[in-house]
Amino acid sequence: MLDNIHNLHKEATDKILSTSSLEELENIRSAYFGKSGFITVYLRNISTIKNLEERKSVGNVVNTIYSELKSLINSHRTKLHQIQIDNQLLQDKVDISLPIRPQKIGKLHPISNVLNEVKRIFLSLGFKLYDGPELEDEFHVFDALNTNKNHPAREENDTFYLKTLVNNKRVVLRTHTSSVQIRTMENNDGIYPIKVIAPGKVYRNDWDATHSPMFHQIEGLYIDKNINMGHLKYCINYFLNKFFGKNVQIRFRNSYFPFTEPSAEVDIKCNQNDWIEILGCGMVHSNVLTNVNIDPNQYSGFAFGIGIERITMLKYNISDLRKFYTNNLQWLDHYGFHFTHLTI
């Protein structure tokens, strides 16, 4: 096994040093350190080695190789990035004899515009805006939301954890703004209804054309007596018709989330036969209500979560999520909005 690991180390090192583009380097990183990457698989399999000494030996070697390759990727990324900047500077030489162009007014980023639009729609339904910390403890992100200890979302390959503990608890970059809902219910003091939306940044360990390690989400929560699935469907239908237009076709599909029961995913029809998932929702699980000292025999409610980048891409026909964060002024000029859209 150690021979295979050392061969893998040499192979990865050669590939990293020989690559000449950031895109190739990212593909190599994913191949070795992604969810199903070679190094990731070895790390997972260490616990299956029965011999204690062999497990320690293999564990030390794999962890050392893990650190070395991570460091090598980071240093090579810095080098390639500098080369890219140098090449760009050579291409972007400015003719100083040209006359000065009039100053342009900047545009509102499409994410900011859509966030404002979504807030306006839900505020018109009587929801209130709430905010919460992006650094959270595991209770508010996972435990209170009925997410068990072995759930895949809690793995370090999917979630960003801090190395240091706070009050002997692990701290995580929140994976959803549901943590704001938990804090809102905790601090409710028996005042109903609870009708809130929680927009904000969330973090997950993923990076490709449709996923980003940081993205924006808005979650909604409505708790009161006698709230049912009909209230949820009305709310979602109202939002989607306002956001995408009155002719949008909508369907609800059965799904599973640990924090809602029943749960549903909502799709809209894009072409003649194509349905695209828009959001997840459901009736708040009784365990979640119990965890925040709300009696599920008296109160019920619904919750939903919407990915802002996702609905922005669909509404404005943007194919690559990564373009939102490249600071490309030409792209922003094309997809951005005039500052008069900045209202709520």
From Swiss-Prot:
Cofactor note: Binds 2 magnesium ions per tetramer.
Cofactor: Mg(2+)
Intracellular or extracellular location(s): Cytoplasm
GO CC terms, sorted: cytoplasm
GO molecular function, one term: phenylalanine-tRNA ligase activity
Any GO BP: phenylalanyl-tRNA aminoacylation
Domain of life: Bacteria
Binding site residues for Mg(2+): 261
EC code(s) of this entry: 6.1.1.20
Pfam family, one: Phe_tRNA-synt_N
Catalytic reactions of this protein: tRNA(Phe) + L-phenylalanine + ATP = L-phenylalanyl-tRNA(Phe) + AMP + diphosphate + H(+)
Enzyme class per UniProt: ligase
The keyword Ligase is assigned to this record: yes
UniProt cross-references to NCBIfam families, sorted A to Z: pheS
Family: Belongs to the class-II aminoacyl-tRNA synthetase family. Phe-tRNA synthetase alpha subunit type 1 subfamily.
Protein name as catalogued: Phenylalanine--tRNA ligase alpha subunit
Species name: Ehrlichia ruminantium (strain Gardel)
Lineage: Bacteria, Pseudomonadati, Pseudomonadota, Alphaproteobacteria, Rickettsiales
Gene: pheS
